[in-house]
Every structure is written in structure tokens, then in C-alpha cells.
């Protein structure tokens, strides 16, 4: 079966036919690094990591670009409020996003360009737009003339009369529907030289210029969150087409993570940061949960839903680990036809997971019935399918994390045992003050101590 993808622009499932046979070029709108990532931010990374893995599994040479927006109004405002340099603020949270992606096992992109590193490409694209009659300079700003592009609105379905760019009208705009390509220099803000004066780039220009620079005038797939369809992606198309590029052939958009039916966002105050959620579940469990819904569907968050997702992953993991323990090494095998049909149908992960869980049930029956070779064969299939979804429990990414955690636990055990011996000695000497002080310090560190007939035992409190 041919891979079919839902293209936002045509509003239809389309067979994936790459521009160059055997090669796939993908651009994913990455983070605006204004603060710590929440699980809504990283859902797109997880969703389109599955697309990338599925293409790689079919021997495509995949060029995968994920940008970093490191200059933008929110970054400048938050850095100023905190009294920190804008570049330091951006770099700090870029590292936070990189850490989050790594924790969730998202493959690193082929390249991760920063907007500030591509001013030359942006200036060159603006010049082409002006030369082609699609942009104009006014008052130090540069604007895109929306009326000059007859197909404006083709991606989002917006009618020109209804367009609102979400930015100030601007005294120098010819039409309030025009959008900003370049912002004139303001006191205290970073700026770069251009033929039209110093300033900094508008949000939309960055991605068009970087996509063209790395993937060429035409490339296969452009991905991003549903909230980017308008105005960001609509404006990307307008810029690129009017600059002479064919641009993206397919447009894919993932749904939001919602809470109470509303999009998870910092402004609504319903943010769950990745570090905080990872206090509740392991990284592979969070990845399983974020990837368990169809990428185009909304994912309604609740603690119960997260726990159910984690439990579902542990059932799969338990089967694979039990099989390895009883039947020996479990190599990565081949996925099933049903799994392939599901992913070829617009990356239908829920149907793919239904196949995985069906195989796990079949494998557990074989394992419990003593058919070790049968269970081993099924576990090999399960590993192949989980690998595409990025949650194979025997993958080095997750086993290394487990090994690191085990080493950390061993080191902690040595330290805690030393404290417990000190507590035992104090109790034997009836020095209750010292014994209580040791106990209280361990409690503050998140360590619970239980006195047993065989001596004290310790454990980490839930969520530590």
C-alpha cells in the first residue's frame, strides 16, 4: 500500500510521491524559545518523528529540518522583564527544548537552523519580493502586499475580506491586511543592516527563507501545529510563491493538546511543562501517551488519561521484557501487514497500536503456555512496530536511560545506607535527637524509611 497523507491545502488524502525518488524532504516549524516547553509544544515533534521513522524504514533518504525561532516579540519582552540579554534568554530555552526532545526519544533533525543565523537569506528573499512587485518598504519596515497574490487564503480557506493578521495595522501599511516582513529598528532591540534600514525579521519570513536555503525552491512536506495554518503557514506560502519558489508539496498539521477543551497555552495558565510531567511518568510513557491519538486529532489531557497511557505502555513493555527473560534475546523483526496498512493510512497510530496490543495478547498466551519460540517471534514483531513509534523498550535510547537510572540509584543507596547506619547507631545510644535529625533530613530529600525486622529499608516518595 502507498503512504497516503492528509494535505491541509487540498483537504484530501493524497498518495505520497516525493519530488526525487528515494528522497524525502521535510520542514517542521520548531520552537519559539520564549520559555520552558510544555507537552503541547512537543506533540508535533513526537507526531512527525513517527512520519520520519516510517519514511526511514522504507529506505528513504530523509532531510529533516526543524527550525528555532530565536528572535521574536515575546522573547524580547520576557527577556527584558527578567533583566536578561535576549540572546541568553533564547539560548537557555533552546537548550530546554533540546533536552525535552531528547528525553522523549525524538530523532535529532538533519539540521536545526536558528532564525538569527539566516538574516542574509531573508534579506535576499525580501529583495526578490520587492522586485517582483509583491512587497514594499515604508517607514523602515517592509510589508508583503497581500492583494498582489490572488491565491492568498488557499491553505486556510480565509477570504481576503476576513483576513486579520494579528499584528498592529501600522501607519505605513497600504492595506491593514498586509503583513510585516521586516521590522524597523527600535531603541534597545537587536537589529541587522538591510538596504531599507536596520531592523529585525518578521516571524513569517524566517521559515520561508530557511526552508528554501536548506531544502531548495521545492520540497516535499511542511509540518506544524494546527494553530500555525493561519497566519503563519498561509503567509509562508504567499512569500515563497511570490519569490518564485514552488515550496511545499504537502502540508501536514497536528492537533493540539487540550485541557477542558481549550488549547494548552501559557496565556491560559493551564501549562504542564515537560519536566513536571516527567515527575509523574517515565519519558517513554509520556511519549506513548502523546503519540497514542491520531496526529490530526485533539488530545485531551487529564492525569487519568496520562496514567492510562502509561499503564498501556507498561503492558507492552512487560510482555517484551518477560519474553526476553524466558526465551532469550529478542531481535527486531518485521512489522505486521495490519500495522503497515494503519501507518500508510495517514499515520493512523491508534489502529497501529490496536495491532500492537493484539499481538501482545497473543504473545502472552504463547508465553504462559510455554511456547517460548512463538512468544519470541511475536515479541520480535512487537519490537519492530514499537521502533517505528519510537517506544521500543529494548532500544538503546531507553535501555541506556534505565542503566543510568540504575547507576544513580546504586550511588544513592550507598549514601542513604550510610545515613541509616548513623541513625541506627544514634538509636542504639538513645541519642534520639540525632536519630530524628537524620530521619527528617531524609524525608526532606524525598526518601521514605520503613523499619522492618531485617533493618531499615528506604524508597523514593512517589513523584521523586
Curated annotation (Swiss-Prot):
One of its GO terms (cellular component) is cytosol. It is an enzyme of class 6 (ligase). Its main location: cytoplasm. It catalyses: tRNA(Cys) + L-cysteine + ATP = L-cysteinyl-tRNA(Cys) + AMP + diphosphate. Its EC number is 6.1.1.16. It comes from the Bacteria. GO terms for biological process: cysteinyl-tRNA aminoacylation. Its cofactor is Zn(2+). One of its GO terms (molecular function) is zinc ion binding. It is found in: Cytoplasm. ATP binds at residue 266. Monomer. This is Cysteine--tRNA ligase. It comes from Rhodococcus jostii (strain RHA1). The gene is cysS.
Amino acid at each position: 500500500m502507498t503512504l497516503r497523507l492528509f494535505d491541509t491545502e487540498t483537504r484530501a488524502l493524497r498518495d505520497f510521491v516525493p519530488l526525487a525518488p528515494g528522497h524525502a524532504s521535510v520542514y517542521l516549524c520548531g520552537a519559539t524559545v520564549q520559555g520552558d516547553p510544555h507537552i503541547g509544544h512537543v506533540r508535533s515533534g513526537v507526531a512527525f518523528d513517527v512520519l520520519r521513522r516510517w519514511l526511514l524504514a522504507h529506505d528513504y533518504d530523509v532531510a529533516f529540518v526543524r527550525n528555532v525561532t530565536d528572535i521574536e516579540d515575546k522573547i524580547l519582552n520576557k527577556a527584558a522583564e527578567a533583566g536578561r540579554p535576549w540572546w541568553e534568554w533564547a539560548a537557555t530555552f533552546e537548550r530546554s527544548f533540546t533536552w525535552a526532545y531528547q528525553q522523549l526519544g525524538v530523532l535529532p533533525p538533519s539540521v536545526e537552523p536558528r532564525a538569527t543565523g539566516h538574516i542574509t537569506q531573508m534579506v535576499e528573499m525580501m529583495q526578490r519580493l520587492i522586485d517582483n512587485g509583491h512587497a514594499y518598504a515604508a517607514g523602515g519596515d517592509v510589508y508583503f502586499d497581500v492583494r498582489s497574490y490572488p491565491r492568498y487564503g488557499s491553505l486556510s480557506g480565509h477570504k481576503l475580506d476576513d483576513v486579520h493578521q494579528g499584528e498592529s495595522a501600522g501607519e505605513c501599511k497600504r492595506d491593514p491586511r498586509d503583513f510585516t516582513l521586516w521590522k524597523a529598528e527600535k531603541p534597545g532591540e537587536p537589529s541587522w543592516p538591510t538596504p531599507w534600514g536596520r531592523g529585525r525579521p518578521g516571524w513569517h519570513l524566517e521559515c520561508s527563507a530557511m526552508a528554501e536555503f536548506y531544502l531548495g525552491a521545492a520540497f516535499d512536506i511542511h509540518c506544524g501545529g494546527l494553530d500555525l495554518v493561519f497566519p503563519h503557514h498561509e503567509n509562508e506560502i504567499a512569500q515563497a510563491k511570490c519569490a518564485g519558489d514552488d515550496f511545499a508539496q504537502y502540508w501536514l498539521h497536528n492537533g493540539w493538546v487540550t485541557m477542558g477543551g481549550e488549547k494548552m497555552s501559557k496565556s491560559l495558565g493551564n501549562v504542564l511543562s515537560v519536566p513536571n510531567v516527567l515527575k509523574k511518568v517515565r519519558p517513554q510513557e509520556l511519549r506513548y501517551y502523546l503519540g497514542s491519538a491520531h496526529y490530526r486529532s485533539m488530545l485531551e489531557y487529564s492525569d487519568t488519561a496520562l496514567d492510562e497511557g502509561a499503564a498501556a505502555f507498561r503492558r507492552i513493555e512487560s510482555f517484551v521484557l518477560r519474553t526476553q527473560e524466558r526465551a532469550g534475546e529478542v531481535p527486531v523483526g518485521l512489522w505486521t501487514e495490519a500495522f503497515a496498512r494503519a501507518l500508510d493510512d495517514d499515520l493512523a497510530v491508534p489502529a497501529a497500536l490496536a495491532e500492537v496490543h493484539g499481538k501482545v495478547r497473543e504473545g502472552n498466551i504463547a508465553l504462559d503456555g510455554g511456547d517460548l519460540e512463538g512468544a519470541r517471534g511475536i515479541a520480535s514483531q512487537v519490537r519492530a512496530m514499537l521502533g517505528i513509534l519510537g517506544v521500543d523498550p529494548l532500544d538503546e535510547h531507553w535501555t541506556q536511560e534505565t542503566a543510568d537510572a540504575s547507576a544513580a540509584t546504586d550511588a544513592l543507596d550507598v549514601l542513604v545506607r550510610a545515613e541509616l547506619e548513623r541513625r541506627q547507631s544514634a538509636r542504639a545510644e538513645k541519642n534520639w535527637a540525632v536519630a530524628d535529625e537524620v530521619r527528617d533530613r531524609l524525608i526532606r530529600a524525598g526518601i521514605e524509611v520503613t523499619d522492618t525486622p531485617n533493618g531499615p529499608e528506604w524508597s523514593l516518595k512517589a513523584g521523586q
